[in-house]
């Protein structure tokens, strides 16, 4: 579910153009890294706390 939220947020912001399928695959990781770079974050491709926070996604 978290991956779906991240994909949707990245799509709204123009970083992700793939299917919102909940899979943390290569295309999703590339989009995360691009977003992290634009935000001045470490480019890990992971859904870390800082990245989620910048995307406005709260962790349950």
Spell out what each predicted region is.
Residues 1-44, 54-55:
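A short amphipathic alpha-helical interaction element
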Residues 46-60:
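Alpha-helical interaction/regulatory segments in DNA maintenance proteins
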